[in-house]
Curated annotation (Swiss-Prot):
Residues 1-32 form a propeptide. The record marks G18, S19, G32, A33 as: Cleavage. Belongs to the orthopoxvirus OPG098 family. This is Core protein VP8. It comes from Vaccinia virus (strain Copenhagen) (VACV). It comes from the Viruses. Major core structural protein. Undergoes morphogenesis-associated proteolysis which cleaves the 28 kDa to a 25-kDa product. Proteolytic cleavage of major core proteins P4a (OPG136), P4b (OPG129), and VP8 (OPG098), which occurs at a late stage of core formation, is required for production of infectious mature virions (MV). Keywords: Host cytoplasm, Late protein, Virion.
Length: 251
């Protein structure tokens, strides 16, 4: 499936998450290119979570994790091949926490989407680009760990010439072109779906607690697109009202 999710954004690529300027950076991409992970809004920014590293991992925390995922109901239905079957809360959880998924990148409290650079286009230069298209049904999924998990960072001063597997049952704070995300490895063994939220046509969030509410929401898609500025406001609202994990990082 293309990294640009259908029914999630407009036809053109509207963002880029940095270019590959060095061979080492190319290796970093290769280190995660074959990883299996659930597609989400982060795929728009060409974020491919890595399953290997050439740095030593340093333990920085052992705690419970709460993180977020943005996607659309269409994306999940399409990836699950549901056809005319109804999308349920159980199906959403099974999609993200499929045992075949090696890694799941999560938005956390110090994930800053303003670091994203709008891609220049010869046809249009509108910086307030569309994130979720009119007619789509975007959702916000909140995940949390069942118990405390070790959180690591890469020691950039300990580079090796070879890549080694990061391993299972751990989390790694990673940065992709200025965007901090928390990668959780073997998420099916440590994570659970805590809540699902839909987007109202007033750019607010509403909790979807039952399959009936989920079905009702899917039958009332967005009447207007959600653009970058509105999305950034929604993300800040999420951070203020949902205690996402905060992991301070040094650039």
């Amino acid at each position: 499936m293309s990294l640009l999710l259908e029914n999630l954004i407009e036809e053109d690529t509207i963002f880029f998450a940095g270019s590959i300027s060095e061979y080492d950076d190319l290796q970093m991409v290769i280190a995660g290119a074959k990883s299996k992970f659930p597609r989400s809004m982060l795929s728009i920014f060409n974020i491919v979570p890595r399953t290997m590293s050439k740095y030593e991992l340093e333990l920085i925390h052992n705690e419970n994790i709460t993180g977020a995922m943005f996607t659309t109901m269409y994306n999940i239905r399409n990836n699950l091949g549901l056809g005319d079957d109804k999308l349920t809360i159980e199906a959403i959880e099974n999609y993200f926490l499929d045992p075949n998924n090696e890694v799941m990148p999560l938005i956390i409290n110090n994930t800053d989407m303003t670091a994203v650079i709008p891609k220049k286009s010869g046809r249009r230069k509108n910086k307030n680009m569309v994130i979720f298209r009119q007619g789509s049904s975007p959702i916000l999924c909140i995940f949390e760990t069942r118990k405390k998990i070790n959180i690591y960072k890469e020691n950039m001063e300990s580079a090796s010439t070879e890549y080694t597997p990061i391993g299972d049952n751990k989390a790694l704070i990673s940065k992709y072109a200025g965007i901090n995300v928390l990668n959780v490895y073997s998420p099916s063994t440590s994570m659970r779906l805590n809540a699902i939220y839909g987007f109202t046509n007033k750019n607010k969030l509403e909790k979807l607690s039952t399959n009936k509410e989920l079905e009702s929401y899917s039958s009332s898609p967005l009447q207007e697109p959600i653009r970058l500025n509105d999305f950034l406001g929604l993300l800040e609202c999420v951070k203020k009202n949902i205690p996402l994990t905060d992991i301070p990082t040094k650039d």
